[in-house]
UniProtKB/Swiss-Prot annotation:
Residues 757-766 have a biased composition (Polar residues). The keyword Transferase does not apply. It comes from the Eukaryota. Residues 740-766 are annotated as: Disordered. Residues 544-581, 633-692 form a coiled coil. CDD domains: BRO1_ScRim20-like (cd09241), V_Alix_like (cd08915). Interacts with RIM101 by binding to its two YPX[LI] motifs. Residues 4-395 form the BRO1 domain. SMART domains: BRO1. This is pH-response regulator protein palA/RIM20. The keyword Coiled coil applies. Belongs to the palA/RIM20 family. InterPro entries: ALIX_V_dom, BRO1_dom, BRO1_sf.
Length: 766
């Protein structure tokens, strides 16, 4: 394009089959068949492929349509799919050749890139309009403001991301605010220049042209400042905007010199022309690599200023003899800004009828359903499983403390294995015996190691950030490096990490207890695992004792009550199985889906956050289906209390009647049987402790990974903040002329006008 303006080249991207990527996500994560969305998947695939085919300097209206459609469809995809579900690769094009690729697993980053492509489109469309017709200049200005609006929208979105405490996305380095600020400022400056050019063609007053010129200079000055702050803006562009800055400053003072001449202010006329010529000289010092059209314009202006200055100086020296003020003594030229970033209307509104994936559940709803399913699992564990295990423990402890059923087994079965011992052996073998425990201990050891690694990862990240901050604080000085120290900024994370370490230290003590608990009963567990043969050899026989009728009746009643204990235990096992089936057959997700469909329009219209709390009423209603089960559990608890009372009374009667007839062989057998009963009770307790330990570490890993992610986000946020502060401090230290952004700003602070120029109206001032 042969022009003295710059356009923003399209970013480049690798082609991916977005439709297929989303299809795989639907298959893995959703409860709907992907075939229901074949048309939508094909449509989004075509849109993404069209994006990868955009060509510089060949823009047409279809480019805008493709970008806008894909941008809006991405908005809906973001609502329906997890943000990190697809990886996209993009290449920067602002430097010398393309840079990258930058790979981002984020739909939001993809949408930012499309907004960038729209800004590029409008910048190129502006340069394709005629610079010699009133209509062409109007359209060009409108396009440039639209381009600035796209880049400004990107800046605002990125600022919101950087302000988030958690869940922030990693912004690619070449889309950092200083680069986007340059692009936005460049577009605004060129839009203002277009109005300036229109004012020339319209023959406007010199006072108007001067104000438009100085404002154009200030906009280019801002662009130069951001260009110097960004590592991705090439020298040609920085020199271009710097030359433009000085060019329009010169043009503004040249127009003011005409006004001074007309107002008989001959000294001020000469001073204004001198400032104009000095600005031209500053522009020429930055002409390297600058477009020939820009330099030709500058040369033409310079020649005009030189010839006018010669005449003005001669007339003043020979005729008027007026004092020539210095630049600082000249009245500032108020700027007249008639442009601003305008987000294209097509971006702000979209036809809902063409939205893709309308019938697909938002992934958030799937997550909410899963969250409530986990809550239901926790409810079942807390309300049924844990209480029943606790009741069973109490019941077993109660029986073993009274030497039951060993005391009556010794009498009734002096040589045979008691049925309870056989059942315990079969149960321990079915669970996996000692192998189950050793495997569980190995698993806990692995989980412990993983937990420690995550903890160390959190500590390492904070240390790295603190070291980086210390280096910059030492380099820049504590007064200049004006941001909170790492110890202050990371205090919340330090507290979390300290608590994590305390939890692990406490858990280590618990692990040691479990190991000692296992070693204590390990020989007896191996005996249980040996089955009938090992047990019959280990348990000593006792001599047969003839019992009187009363003791025999007591033993029979005790046996019945102990059998009732087994019956209650089996009843509870069956009860938990029924609970599991009920929970599995009554998934809460359909209820959440129905509720979402009823209220989704209201939620979206009110822009309300959809989260777990939005469906609390659904969960409360759903969980009432377990009310009858809660009543059963309460009845079972009362039945156990009554049963324990009966056993205790009868056992006391048994002990009082039988203590005189117990011989040594019976005592030894009873002692061994009681030991085996105690081992079984401790085995159940050990299994429970192992499960709790495994659950603790699994939960710890999930929660500590969240902390690790928060630490990553914190470090990233601090690095972005530090880079911006470093650039700010470095810019303060750069010599004035090298930045190319300061000549006009101190002397002529911008005075914003009352409105923004509408191309359909003339130029007006408030």
């Amino acid at each position: 394009m042969n022009t003295n303006l710059l356009y923003i080249p399209y970013r480049e991207t690798d082609i991916i089959d977005l439709g297929n990527e989303l299809r795989n996500i639907i298959k893995m994560e959703y409860f709907q068949p992907s075939s229901n969305f074949d048309r939508d998947l094909q449509a989004v695939r075509n849109l993404r492929n069209n994006i990868s085919n955009l060509k510089n300097e060949q823009v047409n209206n279809n480019d805008e349509t493709v970008c806008v459609q894909y941008y809006h469809q991405l908005s809906n995809v973001i609502k329906k799919f997890p943000d990190e579900c697809v990886e996209f690769s993009w290449y920067g094009t602002l430097g010398y050749g393309r840079s990258g690729p930058t790979r981002s697993r984020s739909l939001r980053i993809e949408q930012l890139n499309i907004l960038y492509q729209l800004g590029s489109y409008f910048s190129q469309a502006a340069l394709m309009e005629s610079r010699y017709s009133d209509e062409g200049l109007k359209k060009s200005c409108s396009y440039l403001q639209a381009a600035a609006g796209c880049f400004n929208s990107m800046i605002l979105q990125i600022q919101k991301e950087n302000e988030k405490e958690t869940g922030m996305i990693r912004i690619p380095r070449d889309l950092q605010p200083e680069t986007l600020q340059f692009l936005k400022s460049l577009m605004i400056a060129q839009a203002q220049e277009t109005i300036w050019q229109k004012s020339l063609a319209s023959g406007m007053k010199d006072s108007v042209i001067a104000r438009l010129s100085i404002q154009t200079s200030e906009y280019y000055s801002t662009a130069a400042k951001y260009g110097n702050s960004s590592e991705f803006i090439k020298l040609e562009w920085i020199n271009h905007v710097t030359v433009k800055q000085f060019h329009f400053k010169a043009a503004a003072h040249y127009r003011v010199s005409i006004l001074n001449h007309e107002g008989f202010k001959y000294g001020e006329q000469v001073a204004s022309l001198q400032v104009a010529l000095s600005s031209c000289d500053s522009a020429f010092r930055k002409k390297k690599y600058v477009n020939d059209f820009v330099i030709e314009d500058l040369q033409g202006l310079t020649e005009t200023i030189k010839s006018t200055l010669r005449v003005a100086e001669k007339d003043n020296d020979l005729v008027y003899l007026k004092p020539v003020p210095k630049e600082n003594d000249l009245a500032p030229i108020p700027g007249a800004s008639l442009v601003k970033p305008i987000l294209p209307p097509a971006i702000e509104s979209f036809d809902d009828s063409s939205v893709l994936f309308k019938e697909l559940l938002p992934y958030l709803i799937v997550q909410v359903g899963q969250a409530y399913r986990e809550r239901q699992d926790s409810f079942i564990r807390d309300s049924f499983i844990d209480p029943i295990q606790s009741l069973n423990k109490i019941m077993y402890k109660f029986i073993t403390e009274r030497n039951l059923p060993a005391s009556i087994d010794t009498i009734q079965k002096p040589e045979n294995l008691p049925e309870s011992i056989i059942q315990h052996s079969q149960e321990i073998i079915s669970y996996g015996g000692t192998k189950l425990i050793e495997d569980s201990l190995n698993e806990i050891a692995k989980l412990t190691l993983e937990s420690r690694h995550i903890l160390e990862g959190c500590q390492e990240r904070l240390k790295i950030e603190a070291d980086e901050d210390d280096i910059m604080r030492e380099r820049q000085g504590s007064q200049r490096w004006a941001r909170p120290k790492s110890s202050e900024a990371s205090s919340e994370f330090i507290n979390k990490i300290n608590k994590m370490e305390q939890y692990l230290d406490q858990a280590k003590e618990g692990d040691q207890f479990i190991i000692s608990q296992y070693h204590e009963i390990e020989p007896y567990l191996q005996l249980y695992c040996g089955g009938y043969k090992e047990l019959i050899q280990f348990i000593p026989n006792s001599t047969y004792v003839k019992l009187d009728t009363k003791i025999n009746e007591i033993i029979i009643k005790l046996r019945e009550l102990i059998n009732e204990v087994s019956r209650i235990e089996n009843q509870r096992k069956q009860f938990l199985t029924r609970i599991e089936i009920k929970a599995r057959n009554n998934n809460i997700l359909p209820s959440i889906i129905d509720s979402f469909k009823k209220k989704q329009r209201k939620l979206y219209e009110e822009n309300a956050a959809i989260d777990e709390r939005s469906f609390e009423d659904v969960y409360a209603k759903h969980i009432t289906m377990f009310n009858s089960d809660l009543r059963f559990l309460e009845d079972s608890k009362h039945a156990q209390i009554a049963l324990e009372g009966n056993i205790d009374d009868l056992n006391q009667e048994f002990e009082s009647e039988y203590q005189h007839t117990n011989n040594e062989s019976q005592y030894k057998r009873q002692e061994v049987l009681q030991t085996l009963e105690n081992v079984y009770t401790k085995y159940l307790e050990l299994i429970s402790n192992l499960n709790e330990g495994s659950k603790f570490y699994s939960d710890f890993i999930i929660k500590s990974n969240s902390v690790l992610k928060e630490c990553d986000e914190y470090v990233y946020h601090r690095r972005v903040e530090g880079r911006e502060l470093e650039m700010f401090l470095n810019n303060q230290a750069v010599p004035v002329e090298s930045v190319g952004s300061q000549q006009s700003a101190p002397d002529f602070p911008p005075q914003p006008m009352g409105g923004t120029w509408n191309p359909n109206n003339g130029i007006k001032f408030g």
